[in-house]
Amino acid sequence: MTSNENDLNSGEEVLTFGFSTLAQRYEDIVLPEAKPFQEILIVVQNPTDLSINLHSEREDIRVVELKSLGVAKSRNVAISQARGRYMIFADDDVTFKKDGLIEALEYFEANPDCTLILGKTVDEHGHPRKRYPVKHERLTRYNSARAGTIEMMIRVEAIRSAGITFDENFGAGAENFLGDEYIFISDLVKKGLRADYLPIVLAEHPAISSGNVWETERDLKVRAQVFKRVFGKWAFFIRIALVIRQIPRGLSISRALFFIKG
């Protein structure tokens, strides 16, 4: 595959945009421009049976309605339903960057053992939404805790064959409201699959902060559970290492001890 977009125009669905949204935000989705090599799969969480029109005039769009809530559940449906060779996860307020997507697809084609790519996102002003590494990195349990779903592109069949799914006990809409992306990457790596970070911009997303995950006891409890899920019996020591980094940034001793105890 070359960088020329026309090389993708083969009639095969190469890329799936896997959107996850709530019913009340369904009509707010920023849809990518129609292309012959892509499909747009929209998973709508509609537990209250909100009356919405799920029909689309575009042939490249498919909509799946869920009568349940939870972003991890909707991502798993997207994995099971995707027709593309690759899939990038999407939220309703994301705008994708064509050049970055093509570069990621080229990387997948050149590296057939790569199962997941983690890229970058920028805000509406073009500024990086977080601190990103400047060079390519192989992902591990130790460097992927800050991954975001909309930064992730997967090789669909490899993920399905390995039986990797998002843990539905974590993520927005679940009691443990964060960490689903980190757990997904960790499970992938534990199974011996390859995941790479690339310093390429995949999408634009508004610079909306969900708050400091060290702020409340609930935040600390959930974050502790994430590390327990990823590291098992070694989570206690990982939490100590994290606290050592966070105390100089303002984490109180009492909250540090609460987090360490899990």
Task: Please identify what each model-predicted range represents.
Residues 1-39, 52:
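N-proximal low-complexity "stem/linker" segments adjacent to membrane-targeting elements
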Residues 66-82:
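Glycine-rich, basic loop-to-helix element that forms the pyrophosphate-binding segment
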Residues 87:
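Short aromatic/hydrophobic "clamp" motif used to bind/position activated sugar donors
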Residues 91-95:
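The conserved acidic donor/metal-binding loop of glycosyltransferases
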Residues 99-132:
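Conserved donor NDP-sugar-binding/catalytic core segment of glycosyltransferases
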Residues 152, 158-159, 169-198:
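A short, conserved alpha-helix in the catalytic core of glycosyltransferases
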Residues 172-176, 194-214, 223-226:
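Active-site donor/metal-binding and catalytic loop motifs
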Residues 212-237, 259-262:
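Catalytic core of nucleotide-sugar-dependent glycosyltransferases
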